[in-house]
Structures are given as structure tokens and as C-alpha cells.
């Protein structure tokens, strides 16, 4: 049986909130050649929202998303770095799905 890709399959992430605005760009254009946009995944956005906006612990956020605390830590670290990079460098930020997300409905 052929294997697609390397390593283990990525576990599905439970996402409760899809952002209304998914594309952010600086009001004033940069001087010089434009830098490529920064891409943030729904997983990173959800980790940032749960921990920094809702005030959950990483353990609680992991349970809500159906992943380990370590996975939340990695997603959160990556999301924070991308937001800081966007602000400091004046770059675009685009939030996109990665393909391994499951949207949680209110009934669950």
C-alpha cells in the first residue's frame, strides 16, 4: 500500500471560529520591493484566539481543539511570531485553512 507524504498523518483540529476578516495589509505601502505575505493557518489562529483572547490555558485550549498541549504551544508560538512579524515589517497577513480542520457546530 503506497504512503502519501512523510511521517504520521496530521490529526484533525477542531475549529470553533472562522475569522470574518482573513486578509490584513498595511494602510501605507512599504518603500522598496514588496515582501511576500505571511500565511497563518486556521489552527494557529484558533490557538491564538483561545489562549490570548479567551484566556484559556494551553491545556484547556488543547482539549477544545482535540490536540495535545504541545501542539497548542507550537501553533501559538508560530502565530505570535507571525503577528509580530506583520506589525514590525509592515507585511500582509493572510489566514487560510490547511485542510485538516473540522468546524465545530454549536450543537456539539
Swiss-Prot record:
HAMAP family: UPF0251. Belongs to the UPF0251 family. This is UPF0251 protein PF0620. It comes from Pyrococcus furiosus (strain ATCC 43587 / DSM 3638 / JCM 8422 / Vc1).
Amino acid at each position: 500500500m503506497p504512503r502519501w507524504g512523510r511521517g504520521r498523518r496530521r490529526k484533525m483540529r477542531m475549529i470553533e471560529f472562522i475569522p470574518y476578516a482573513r486578509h490584513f495589509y498595511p494602510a501605507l505601502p512599504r518603500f522598496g520591493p514588496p515582501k511576500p505575505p505571511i500565511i497563518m493557518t486556521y489552527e494557529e489562529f484558533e490557538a491564538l484566539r483561545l489562549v490570548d483572547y479567551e484566556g484559556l490555558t494551553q491545556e484547556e485550549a488543547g482539549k477544545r481543539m482535540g490536540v495535545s498541549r504541545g501542539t497548542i504551544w507550537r501553533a501559538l508560538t508560530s502565530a505570535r511570531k507571525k503577528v509580530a512579524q506583520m506589525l514590525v515589517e509592515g507585511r500582509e497577513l493572510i489566514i487560510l485553512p490547511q485542510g485538516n480542520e473540522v468546524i465545530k457546530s454549536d450543537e456539539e
